[in-house]
Amino acid sequence: MGCTVSLVCCEALEPLPSCGPQPPGTPPGPARPERCEPGGAAPDPRRRLLLQPEDLEAPKTHHFKVKAFKKVKPCGICRQAITREGCVCKVCSFSCHRKCQAKVAAPCVPPSSHELVPITTETVPKNVVDVGEGDCRVGSSPKNLEEGGSMRVSPSIQPQPQSQPTSLSRNTSVSRAMEDSCELDLVYVTERIIAVSFPSTANEENFRSNLREVAQMLKSKHGGNYLLFNLSEQRPDITKLHAKVLEFGWPDLHTPALEKICSVCKAMDTWLNADPHNVVVLHNKGNRGRIGVVIAAYLHYSNISASADQALDRFAMKRFYEDKIVPIGQPSQRRYVHYFSGLLSGSIKMNNKPLFLHHVIMHGIPNFESKGGCRPFLRIYQAMQPVYTSGIYNIPGDSQASICITIEPGLLLKGDILLKCYHKKFRSPARDVIFRVQFHTCAIHDLGVVFGKEDLDEAFKDDRFPDYGKVEFVFSYGPEKIQGMEHLENGPSVSVDYNTSDPLIRWDSYDNFSGHREDGMEEVVGHTQGPLDGSLYAKVKKKDSLNGSSGPVTTARPALSATPNHVEHTLSVSSDSGNSTASTKTDKTDEPVSGATTAPAALSPQEKKELDRLLSGFGVDREKQGAMYRAQQLRSHPGGGPTVPSPGRHIVPAQVHVNGGALASERETDILDDELPIQDGQSGGSMGTLSSLDGVTNTSESGYPETLSPLTNGLDKPYSTEPVLNGGGYPYEAANRVIPVHSSHSAPIRPSYSAQEGLAGYQREGPHPAWSQQVTSAHCGCDPSGLFRSQSFPDVEPQLPQAPTRGGSSREAVQRGLNSWQQQQPHPPPRQQERSPLQSLARSKPSPQLSAETPVAALPEFPRAASQQEIEQSIETLNMLMLDLEPASAAAPLHKSQSVPGAWPGASPLSSQPLLGSSRQSHPLTQSRSGYIPSGHSLGTPELVSSGRPYSPYDYQLHPAGSNQSFHPKSPASSTFLPSPHSSAGPQEPPASLPGLIAQPQLPPKETTSDPSRTPEEEPLNLEGLVAHRVAGVQARERQPAEPPGPLRRRAASDGQYENQSPEATSPRSPGVRSPVQCVSPELALTIALNPGGRPKEPHLHSYKEAFEEMEGTSPSSPPHSVARSPPGLAKTPLSALGLKPHNPADILLHPTGVARRLIQPEEDEGEEVTKPPEEPRSYVESVARTAVAGPRAQDVEPKSFSAPAAHAYGHETPLRNGTPGGSFVSPSPLSTSSPILSADSTSVGSFPSVVSSDQGPRTPFQPMLDSSIRSGSLGQPSPAALSYQSSSPVPVGGSSYNSPDYSLQPFSSSPESQGQPQYSAASVHMVPGSPQARHRTVGTNTPPSPGFGRRAVNPTMAAPGSPSLSHRQVMGPSGPGFHGNVVSGHPASAATTPGSPSLGRHPVGSHQVPGLHSSVVTTPGSPSLGRHPGAHQGNLASSLHSNAVISPGSPSLGRHLGGSGSVVPGSPSLDRHAAYGGYSTPEDRRPTLSRQSSASGYQAPSTPSFPVSPAYYPGLSSPATSPSPDSAAFRQGSPTPALPEKRRMSVGDRAGSLPNYATINGKVSSSPVANGMASGSSTVSFSHTLPDFSKYSMPDNSPETRAKVKFVQDTSKYWYKPEISREQAIALLKDQEPGAFIIRDSHSFRGAYGLAMKVSSPPPTITQQGKKGDMTHELVRHFLIETGPRGVKLKGCPNEPNFGSLSALVYQHSVIPLALPCKLVIPSRDPTDESKDSSGPANSTTDLLKQGAACNVLFVNSVDMESLTGPQAISKATSETLAADPTPAATIVHFKVSAQGITLTDNQRKLFFRRHYPLNTVTFCDLDPQERKWMKTEGGAPAKLFGFVARKQGSTTDNACHLFAELDPNQPASAIVNFVSKVMLSAGQKR
């Protein structure tokens, strides 16, 4: 077996035979000569092993000589600095003072051969062809460089970190000796856990031989009962040799993402518990620290449910870890094990707040230069994506005691963070690693964090780093500069070089980790199997001279000049800003299984079935089976040639999956621009490089590249080959391009799948029908994950079965129904799109250079960086995972990883959030859980839509990967914005044909009609998993923009301690939060932020916080949420997406609107684009942009209106609809003709690939904007609208009415002036009506899209009617101040959702307005939900801004948080849940604390009305403005009031939900929020007055034609989807209905989930047994939770319930078969709210009000025991005691709800409690403080009245407690609350 020695045999205590200890039954391995001694032949191994340590440690005398030290060095004895003369050992270099020489006791240990070379030196290979972050292509450098640093000098020796530089401990020496001498080390850690480890320097031939022997041994001993976990880079030979392999690799010497640790443990536990004979094999090549991390983590994991019979196993694991791993492990690995242990045990609480890194202070200057000092620079990675690169600091020796690297504005960090500090050698193309540190923000609870030398990887064993040295990180909760930190400035001797264009600085090797190593297999095909990427010829791979790995040679893309474009590069001044160094993720090409390939026979059907059952809980998608499947397939076709030409490759972001291992990994790095694939031969250096693209590597949640193996191939030398290859052996050049790496047979693999998924994949994958679906080749599928895969695949893309991939159980449950369709479908579309489409769109904002490597087809898929959302999601997921990890929590032992962790109420704030948002969602929660789930997963599998696939609720179809989802827009308009960046190959990428449209591929071949239905992954909703939602909610709360940036900290001492000071009032986050990248201007940042693509994988995850933030304007005191949200990933948004034109700064037009996708303005404004004057540039980039803007702006851009370019792209002159000058269409702008935009005449949308091409033709001043908008907004990702909806009818582009004038909305401002002015039409995205394909996967073509799916569409775009849901990010406008509104220059931007669009997106980001701008959001009728959180960032903007959101009638919910003042057009059932309109129109906006609180808490209180302000209101309790019923008059035609706007988390009673708003005074409604559609109770803003005269515009709902076209045959969602109503309202509506009547609403307890309330014929037995008395009609209304996950939606807690692609699908299925419900659902034919209104009297009767209750936020001050005292005396006494207390108690914001049931307090932030309920019969008194004392400790310092209520203590009849509160919202005074409580109490007393 090649394994002759086990580490255990090194123990002196256990002299064992040469083969090491073998567990009982272990077959003797084949006899092989001992390798333990490098040269040796082999005396008795036992003796040699025992003696070796002694030999190594034999004491030897030092040979000291006196030396004058020029640079400071610490004394090895006293640790003090040696300043002048000292002694140094000539042998071991041990240094000490002369006086300390006598005290030296440590033996002299000469350095090993591997220590002769500096361990951390990295050099850039000489022949660097491409200058790029990770793109350094090596010509012939003989050295392999490792990011980790060591230079391997001897092939047989692997340097291992030493815990002590001078003396080796026994364990260390033994371990090193073993590692140096043994090729293979196989150890049975326990009887069922085997560790197989090879040194990274193992000879390749021997390594392969040993691999085979290990495989033989495992098969002979364990048969098929072993599962191999590959912890290092992927190798084809591993998957060929073993039937079951899960890829969990990560870079050597690094630590895996926390989520990956969770996934590994879950997978191990599931496998081991499935069968007592199952064993786990941990395979690792490189440092054994990786095995140690897994063993230690599993030790803690299994300890949770520890049992006595496992005690020995745990002891064995502990001993193995301590003896074999600790000596060689890295500090960060130990830190992560500690994190994992703490999170499991609860000792570490999850911190979901966003942390902004402002300063990195290095105390103690390392001596890396001969004269002392060093030249450090930092690179910061988030989820292994570079997000920041600092300048190079030149620090002379002895000049400084510390150095501070300042990042301004603060860099937003979230999730797994890796910070590497390098030393750039002087005049040498090399860099040394000074230190490396990894941490996870969830475990950071202090704003000052210090890591000592022993905590720093690399430095802990480096003498050059002073022993007293430490590194301090200074964080804050906002990007604004921290006050009081001026003393941190460096001295004059420190200079900074910002020339980050040097390839050495930008070089990043992590991109390649996920690639396959090709050196492991002989069966490598030398060419691709046909022109898979759209090129005419197959690409021949030629051996790379350097390492022999082959890589396709591509001439399609000119080599970039070695000299970077400085304009672009300088952008990265002190940050990666993603523009400069963010590297896009490596695209993985997922190769579909060849169409005809037969399923590998590796596993029998029974085995597969069993495995599937076991692993189903993991959420392993079939797509994910990739690796395993691949292995099997490889086995079937060893030659690697597919039996059938491989259908097409899916580019899986971040990882190249090559089944045959035929290709080295390729990666597309967005490093600056070098790596951009060049479009049409244009140089890729433009600013809009991919790097900016959101699409940085998709990192799976785990934070590593998403692919199966999260990191680069070669990680075994994580970096060793950095410079040389992409890890995959491709020269970087090739790597840049997305090269379709096809190995002949690659199973479609999701880039990274969770282990579970992988497991599940095994069986699932099995016998799929040949997947040969046609896909439009070269589509840039915009997968929800936001990656645009440039898919140049053959026409056929394999599709994975579309089963409701839920777990085995759910699948089985639905199997009946599914079988038929599954059989019908050639292959179910992979659920590639874990991310919500929007996300994907945003994410994939293609850079202008989207062009694929080949001009034609392969659009580079834009790798996405982990978007902020994704990262947040990943954190949320992590949180959920931690909760879910507890073995007990799993519903079934085997399904611990069940897709959605239960959303049990008490779980944790996180638990209430749905899984990570869309972004990861594409994969089942589990996936996310697994940590692998790459956001790009979805990408991994092509989103193929079988062209003929029938709609099926279960049919989770992704858009064809190739098809541009965004293109799918049916309407030109949408396409216009949507040109998908990826479709760089433009012509070839015809959008998948729209449902109604026949796609006219601009390029002939490869066009495929994509089925309108999307895979669930695509749905934003689906994408959002419960966990994500729960987590997000929590995060959202925590990171509410309104929340003050955080107390300012003054550093009290240098140790990094800070004193908290009260935050300055209103220190808004920088309006445009630039992405952490400094270079980006606020506008850019906003754009980026809005632009999901800008974020690293921000899919839908969209953490709730973000969603909230988006929804709620951030308060002035807090930075705009957009800012907060903008993840570092922003840096990754392609500049082009921002509208920056590559190469020519002058051309760069910064699109202030930030929403790259401008909404198409109503027709009148169609041709015009509005621009807004930019703020003062904050960075070079911004200034450049500004400059560019200035020029163009000055000019009359009218002609270049956005729409024009679109039109031009086709060369058609589009008629302007409202008299917009035809001239507006200019010559083809960057939108290339190939862009898929619909031509005026044609119904099909052409591919938009080149739309963005920056070089294509002169840009008109506006064009850049257009491009940017397109790019960022919809380009790469078809505009959400467009994408989301493949509508059957085209939408006018830019408002131009192409073929469907009816759909285009009339521009809001038809005024000539607007036309005359250069307005960028905000590219309103019209959702084409009736496009079922919208992101929601709907049940059938005719079924209405599920209302809630596009939960987060950004509101700036208009959704065309019928578009089920706008992808969440797609529609987003820029979020954050500065980009408000799509309109710039004061022109209103209109965002309209056309009728019928069930849901625009959950959080349409409201149009953010800049002061003075008007943005109007119009949702057309029938759109059930515009978006949950249209970012209402404008809340922060000056109040002068007005954003008009008009929801047209019938739109059930505009967006949960429509931003901007929005008028709800009558009929719209619900305006955005948290629309924040106007300046700080809502209390939350005004009070940061409120919004913070609300957003911070994941709990969204039910939308109960606020308290009536004046008693006058009580008599009738009827206020014209308030209407409990969703369809109250407010929604009737003509009524400006919105229907049931979603409450804004109850904060401040601004729930403008359907509940009455009591903010009215004396019954007089003054623009009550309800009336206004504002979420706030304030009556200051009336939407109507901000809207232009609507009579001038043709509102979509006013057009009969439009209305007619918008109708869905079965769209009844408006009757049963009432997102805003509360549980009580649902009961009131249903209690008198027939059994089967139901309503679905948005859950207030579990963010992102839905509540199903249905009437049943009889109450459950438990109710009758309890003998409850009273009105039983309420008990007949039962409530079910519908959770959302990557696979869609499903009833929670029902194992036999499948996942559905949309709410509509779930509803219609249950109307046919009840499944787990008590009875079938009865689809309503009319709105129940109408019926209730008909039958009930006045809408706001006193009874209704009391029944409904009222609520608002107040400050909870204290609870004081009163014994039996009550009445005013109790209130007075409690107040006196509280005010006299020392210290005075801190007040906490709580949600105070009063109803007929009693008083309920909810601590949204869960600081004191979760929820407390005081039944009405226990409340004895409520009143204000009789002495009218005030509470002074309020946020703003204004005194607040105190009030309280007295209630009996639980379980007592005499003892009382008085609960004191202070009013928080001026609109909800204490008197109103007290009056209402008294009224309720009085009413209850009368009843009794």
UniProtKB/Swiss-Prot annotation:
Q: Which UniProt keywords apply?
A: Actin-binding, Cell junction, Cytoplasm, Cytoskeleton, Glycoprotein, Hydrolase, Metal-binding, Phosphoprotein, Protein phosphatase, SH2 domain, Zinc, Zinc-finger
Q: Where is the C2 tensin-type domain?
A: 352-478
Annotated Phosphatase tensin-type domain ranges read 175-347
Q: Start and end residues of each Phorbol-ester/DAG-type zinc finger?
A: 61-108
Q: Where is the composition biased (Pro residues)?
A: 21-31
Q: Please list the residue ranges that the record marks as compositionally biased, kind Basic and acidic residues.
A: 1169-1179
Query: Which Pfam families does UniProt cross-reference here?
Result: PTB, PTEN_C2, SH2
Q: Which SUPFAM superfamilies match?
A: (Phosphotyrosine protein) phosphatases II, C2 domain (Calcium/lipid-binding domain, CaLB), Cysteine-rich domain, PH domain-like, SH2 domain
Residues recorded as bearing Phosphothreonine in the entry: T1015, T1343, T1420
What InterPro entries does the database record attribute to this sequence? Answer: C1-like_sf, C2_domain_sf, PE/DAG-bd, PH-like_dom_sf, Prot-tyrosine_phosphatase-like, PTB, PTB/PI_dom, SH2
What enzyme class is recorded for this protein?
A: hydrolase
Give GO terms: molecular function aspect only.
Answer: actin binding; phosphoprotein phosphatase activity; zinc ion binding
Q: Which GO terms describe its biological process?
A: cell-substrate junction assembly; fibroblast migration
Isomerase in keyword set = no
Phosphoserine: residues bearing it:
509, 535, 549, 604, 792, 867, 930, 935, 952, 1054, 1062, 1118, 1122, 1279, 1331, 1346, 1423, 1448, 1463, 1468, 1535, 1547, 1554, 1599, 1741
Q: Where is the composition biased (Polar residues)?
A: 571-584, 835-852, 962-986, 1057-1069, 1240-1257, 1301-1322, 1436-1446, 1490-1507
Q: Could you give the subunit structure recorded for this chain?
A: Binds to actin filaments and interacts with phosphotyrosine-containing proteins. Interacts with STARD8. Interacts with protein phosphatase PPP1CA. Interacts (via N-terminus) with Rho GTPase-activating protein DLC1; the interaction is decreased by phosphorylation of TNS1. Interacts with tyrosine-phosphorylated proteins BCAR1/p130Cas and PTK2/FAK; the interactions are increased by phosphorylation of TNS1.
Instruction: Give the protein name, as stated in the record.
Output: Tensin-1
The gene that this protein is the product of is: Tns1
